[in-house]
Structure formats: C-alpha cells, structure tokens
C-alpha cells in the first residue's frame, strides 16, 4: 500500500496530537513549591524488612526533575539488584553503614557520608549490619 501526499496530510494532525500527548505525559510532574514534609506523615512502603518513604517527585522552577526518598535498610539487606539509569543520584547516609557498589568496586561508608552516583553507573547499596542503615536519596534529572 502506498500513501499519497494527500493521505499523509490527513495523518499529520493525528501524529502531531500523539507527539504532544507524549510531551504532556513527560510534563505531568508538578513544579515543586516550598513545603515542609513531616516525617511522621510520609506514607511507609514496606519491602520485606526494608522501608522507604517517598518525600517528593517533581520539577524545579526551571523544569528540572528532582525526586527525594528515604530508606531504612535492614542488616544484611540490599537496596535492589545492581542496576543503572540515566538520572544521577546523591545518597546521604544518616545512620548505620552501607557498602556502596559503583564503578565495579564496593566502598564502605558510615553515618554522615555521601555517595554521588553518575548517570549510567551500575550501583546498589548493601547494609553489612549489625544495625539498620537509614539514608536519603536525591535523584536528579530525567529517568529515561
């Protein structure tokens, strides 16, 4: 089946609508306003012995994606299997210790430490114990 220019002219508005729909889907995150997030009011998501709290997921005033979550990682547990993604992450360890995997090596960090994870860097966090580890992760940039 061959398409004429006339056929294509009928398809153009549909393609434009579909493309704008994709742009709208990408921009559904809200622009974040100044706000205090009370720890006790954040919903808790449980995954086995681990817990996480989503704090916010939105856009800065310039449209830059930013997301913050908190995790309580039980002794001997890992955050997730090693993986990589486009966005960058900053992990700030509040309590405990974590073995941070990145760049093909593992580095043990203690409370008060920060780990920066570059785009497309395979990573994960493991709690060597004996106490729970609590940390914040700030994800910067688009996830895809």
What are these regions (language model features)?
Residues 119-144:
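Ligand-binding loop in jelly-roll beta-barrel domains
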Residues 3-7, 11-65:
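A short, N-terminal "cap"/entry segment at the start of jelly-roll beta-barrel domains
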Residues 86-88, 92-98:
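Glycine- and acidic-residue-biased ligand/ion/polar-headgroup-sensing regions
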Residues 78-80, 99, 115, 119-125:
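Histidine-centered metal-chelating micro-motifs
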Residues 66-69, 114:
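Aromatic/pi-system hotspot detector in well-structured domains
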Residues 105-119:
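Short acidic-glycine-tyrosine-enriched beta hairpin
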Residues 69-84:
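Conserved short histidine dyad/triad with adjacent acidic residue
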């Amino acid at each position: 089946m061959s398409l004429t220019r006339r056929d294509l002219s009928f398809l153009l508005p549909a393609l434009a609508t579909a493309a704008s729909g994709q742009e709208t889907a990408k921009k559904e995150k809200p622009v974040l306003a100044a706000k205090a997030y009370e720890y006790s009011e954040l919903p808790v998501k449980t995954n086995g012995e681990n817990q996480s709290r989503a704090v916010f997921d939105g856009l800065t005033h310039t449209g830059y994606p930013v997301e913050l979550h908190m995790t309580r990682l039980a002794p001997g547990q890992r955050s997730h299997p090693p993986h990589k993604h486009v966005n960058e992450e900053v992990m700030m360890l509040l309590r405990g210790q974590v073995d941070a995997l990145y760049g093909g090596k593992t580095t043990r960090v203690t409370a008060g430490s920060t780990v920066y994870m570059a785009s497309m860097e395979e990573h994960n966090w493991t709690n060597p114990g004996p106490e729970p580890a609590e940390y914040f992760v700030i994800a910067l940039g688009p996830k895809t």
